[in-house]
């Protein structure tokens, strides 16, 4: 038994009892080792105070995902018999959409609507200048079933699904894909993975000619980012915990290569557990707010979920051969708020770095946020590594609250920077998979988001074609 850990837990339990009895102030003064603490671990935080402002703020139309006309929505004609959901474009090093021999390329998750375990990465392409949903073509899956075995990688051989990621057009004209290797064989183990995708072009089509340099990069170090073994040791699925290590987004800065990804904090930068409920840094604002909100949280049915909530947008540096060079601190964390901040995205625009993530209200512990609420949250910094401050004062960028059964339900919102101007294109998928016989999950209509320093707003009447990536190009 770890005696130090046991003593710390006992102290927390004593303080919890005091708070529940309404004796918060007395507990603060009784013993120094029972006092709340403030520890940022040198990273930025999505605070409870900021999130509690969102239910009122989200009523403003400038944060609301536009309403779409369901009668105009089409399936992707080339993706016959497939649901298509999370997608990401082939991007240049600066985040703008790459021109690959006259084509735009998108990678997307797709699968059989009748088989929830069928999740693979497909490639789609359209000629530059075309925007119609019908102009998207596909050569099919990126990987053959045998590729994971041919790679001679001890982790890859146990992959059962392919999850979201990113893709970059390298300086030597290659396509480098990053994605999440998911293994259903090992309690949902997730590994950041990469491969070079070889694509040949003609005047009328693109073809996939196999992959090379296919390898695992990172699966958590336990100290900075939770790994699957910690999840298993603490009770795996029965514990109520939600282990994440996925959605790698590639970014370059000052000649260095990085991946930013969805994760959970590790033992040295604010791990999950009851002790986290007493860290003022996770609450924000003031000591008086902390006292009020922490007591309320401890008495609520969300306290167990809150103590397990330690979502993070993590960061690692890569070597030039795309192997792991350095594990870095998270750019931001969501301790006590949510365990799941997805689709990490970061880009530089007009001298500022913008960081965004998607999250579901059903995974949150914030009063006033409902299970149907869907968000894109955003943050801004003067440097890639932070510190990051919330856009629009709270971090709210986009909100959507349609019933998941609605044909025009959207998720996985992703900001695509443009070559010039203050607008980004927002892409997403529409219609949840397997819900309709005739309506497949598909590219949602894109729309514009305007960014002015620390403020954003949805551009009115800016709905674009389904899956459209660029404007004025």
From Swiss-Prot:
Q: Which residues constitute the signal peptide according to the record?
A: 1-29
Listed GO molecular functions?
A: levansucrase activity
| One GO term describing the cellular component | extracellular region
Q: Give yes or no: UniProt keyword Signal.
A: yes
Q: Which UniProt keywords apply?
A: Secreted, Signal
GO BP of this protein: carbohydrate utilization
Localization (cell): Secreted
Q: What CDD domains does the entry give?
A: GH68
- Which InterPro entries does this entry report, sorted A to Z? Glyco_hydro_68, Glyco_hydro_beta-prop_sf
Q: Which family does it belong to?
A: Belongs to the glycosyl hydrolase 68 family.
Question: What name has this protein been given in UniProt?
Answer: Inactive levansucrase
Q: Which organism is it from?
A: Geobacillus stearothermophilus
Species lineage: Bacteria, Bacillati, Bacillota, Bacilli, Bacillales
User: Which gene underlies this protein?
Assistant: sacB
């Amino acid at each position: 038994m770890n005696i130090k850990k046991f003593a710390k837990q006992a102290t927390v339990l004593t303080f919890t009892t005091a708070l529940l009895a309404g004796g918060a102030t007395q507990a603060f003064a009784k013993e120094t080792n029972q006092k709340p603490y403030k520890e940022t671990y040198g990273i930025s935080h999505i605070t409870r105070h900021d999130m509690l402002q969102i239910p009122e703020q989200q009523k403003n139309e400038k944060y609301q995902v536009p309403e779409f006309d369901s009668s105009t929505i089409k399936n992707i004609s080339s993706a016959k018999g497939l649901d298509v959901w999370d997608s990401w474009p082939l991007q240049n090093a600066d985040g703008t959409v790459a021109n690959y021999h006259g084509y735009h390329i998108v990678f997307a998750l797709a699968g059989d609507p009748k088989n929830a375990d069928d999740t693979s990465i497909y490639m789609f392409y359209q000629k530059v200048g075309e925007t119609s949903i019908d102009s998207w073509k596909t050569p099919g899956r990126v990987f053959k079933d045998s590729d994971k075995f041919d790679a001679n990688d001890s982790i890859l051989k146990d992959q059962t699904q392919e999850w979201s990621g990113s893709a970059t057009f390298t300086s030597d004209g290659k396509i480098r894909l990053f994605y999440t290797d998911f293994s259903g064989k090992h309690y949902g183990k997730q590994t950041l993975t990469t491969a070079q995708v070889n694509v040949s072009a003609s005047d009328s089509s693109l073809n996939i000619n196999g992959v090379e340099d296919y390898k695992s990069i990172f699966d958590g170090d336990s100290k900075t980012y939770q790994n699957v073994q910690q999840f298993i040791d603490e009770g795996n699925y029965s514990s109520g915990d939600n282990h994440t290590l996925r959605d790698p987004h590639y970014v370059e800065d000052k000649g260095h290569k990085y991946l930013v990804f969805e994760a959970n904090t590790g033992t040295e930068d604010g791990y999950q557990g009851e002790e986290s409920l007493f860290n003022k840094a996770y609450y924000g604002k003031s000591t008086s707010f902390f006292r009020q909100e922490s007591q309320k949280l401890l008495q609520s049915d969300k306290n167990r979920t809150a103590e397990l909530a330690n979502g993070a947008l993590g960061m690692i540096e890569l070597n030039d051969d795309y192997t792991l060079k350095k594990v870095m601190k998270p750019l931001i964390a969501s301790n006590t708020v949510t365990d799941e901040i997805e689709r990490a995205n970061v880009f530089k625009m007009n001298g500022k770095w913008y960081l965004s993530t998607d999250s579901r209200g059903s995974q949150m512990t914030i009063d006033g946020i409902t299970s149907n609420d869907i968000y894109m949250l955003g943050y801004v910094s003067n440097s890639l590594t932070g510190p990051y401050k919330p856009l629009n004062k709270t971090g709210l960028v986009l909100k959507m609250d349609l019933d998941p059964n609605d044909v025009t339900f959207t998720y996985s919102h992703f900001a695509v920077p443009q070559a010039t101007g203050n607008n980004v294109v927002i892409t997403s998928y529409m219609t949840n998979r397997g819900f309709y016989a005739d309506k497949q999950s598909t590219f949602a209509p894109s729309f514009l988001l305007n960014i002015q320093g620390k403020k954003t707003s949805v551009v009115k009447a800016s709905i674009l074609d389904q899956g459209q990536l660029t404007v004025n190009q």
